[in-house]
């Protein structure tokens, strides 16, 4: 398989722009779906089926389906609403497992295989504008317990779980969709609280989403953890994570302004150790990012090695779970 196809495997794109159709034929790694893509159950199943048939390589077919305010299929539920992580957890372990099984079965019925959940941030800041009830709790042990139930239930029922948002978004006071939040806590404090749930699942979890956060314990400069070699190396070397490190959405302002061009930002992510990238669109400029990096990687040994390494991880997970 050529280098360009391996690079395409590192990207999960959305439907906006329709560039995904050609990208699938070039080896695109996966697709992500939002509420705007989902109108009826029949229509959505047909969309997913069409994408599968067009793909050169089996794709990750993904969604953010946490429950509560992050629920993409609510328009086709016939009035049913899943509870957010906080309220589901408060109803007890049996309820949490049952709801997770319902979500897994629903996602499978549409042909999906990857859910960007659970959210294992420890919600220590009550004024956090982006996490809140998406977190199981503000208690570390509760978050660890919730993660284990949800991830295991997804895994046992054919859905790949992805924990988020490393190294922990719970103390943030800003929304990374709009800006780059800063968490100014020493590493030992981060380890006791926000990093602890990631440490607890690191050796078992298939995928970790890395946040667009500036954590001063990793980088003094204004660099998000998603582009921080120190942060991603810590995840692997200190916590023992051997799976896929994936970015949060790369069009979020917390990361998008980190380079002169979008391809430069993405290249920084590859060099930092990210294995996959989410772009909520497949506009021509997003496809251009892949093409630009592919061209550069042919003459850049480090970039090429990182792409090869990522491809091995992606292939391994696909072979075992898809």
Predicted regions and their residues:
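A charged helix-plus-loop insertion that forms the helical arch/lid used to bind
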Residues: 77-92, 135-137
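N-terminal hydrophobic targeting/anchoring segments and the immediately downstream early-domain regions
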Residues: 1-77
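Second-shell residues forming the walls of enzyme active-site clefts
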Residues: 36-52, 59, 69-71, 145-155, ...
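Glycine-rich anion/phosphate-binding loops
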Residues: 39-46, 88-105, 138-145, 188-192
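Glycine-rich, aromatic-flanked loop segments that form ligand/cofactor-binding clefts
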Residues: 54-80, 96-123, 143-167
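Mid-to-C-terminal alpha-helical segments outside catalytic/metal-binding sites
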Residues: 292-322
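Short, acidic/polar
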Residues: 14-26, 95-106, 190-198, 258-268
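Divalent metal-dependent hydrolysis catalytic cores, especially in the metallo-beta-lactamase
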Residues: 28-35, 113-119, 273-277
């Amino acid at each position: 398989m050529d280098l360009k196809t391996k690079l395409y495997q590192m990207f999960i794109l959305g439907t906006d722009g329709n560039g995904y159709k050609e990208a699938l034929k070039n080896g695109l790694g996966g697709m992500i779906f939002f509420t705007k893509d989902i109108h009826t159950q029949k229509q959505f199943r047909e969309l997913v089926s069409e994408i599968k048939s067009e793909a050169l390589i089996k794709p990750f077919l993904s969604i953010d389906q946490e429950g509560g305010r992050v629920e993409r299929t609510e328009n086709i539920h016939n009035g049913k609403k899943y509870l957010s992580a906080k309220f589901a957890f408060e109803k007890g372990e049996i309820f949490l497992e049952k709801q997770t099984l319902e979500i897994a079965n629903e996602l499978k019925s549409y042909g999906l295989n990857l859910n960007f959940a659970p959210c294992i941030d420890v919600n220590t800041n009550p004024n956090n504008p982006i996490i809140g009830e998406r977190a199981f709790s503000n208690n570390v042990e509760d978050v660890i317990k919730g993660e284990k139930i949800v991830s295991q239930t997804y895994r046992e029922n054919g859905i790949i779980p992805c924990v988020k948002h490393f190294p922990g978004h719970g103390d943030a006071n800003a929304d990374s969709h709009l800006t780059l939040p800063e968490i100014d806590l020493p590493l030992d404090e981060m380890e006791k609280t926000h990093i602890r749930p990631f440490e607890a699942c690191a050796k078992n979890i298939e995928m970790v989403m890395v946040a667009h956060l500036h954590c001063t314990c990793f980088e003094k400069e204004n660099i998000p953890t998603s582009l921080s070699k120190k942060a991603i190396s810590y995840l692997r070397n200190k916590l023992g994570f051997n799976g896929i490190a994936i970015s949060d959405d790369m069009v979020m302002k917390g990361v998008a302004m980190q380079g002169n061009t979008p391809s430069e930002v993405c290249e920084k992510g590859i060099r930092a150790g990210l294995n996959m990238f989410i772009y909520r669109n497949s506009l021509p400029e997003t496809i251009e990012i892949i093409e630009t990096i592919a061209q550069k990687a042919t003459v850049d040994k480090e970039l090429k090695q990182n792409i090869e390494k990522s491809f091995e991880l992606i292939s391994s997970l696909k072979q075992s779970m898809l």
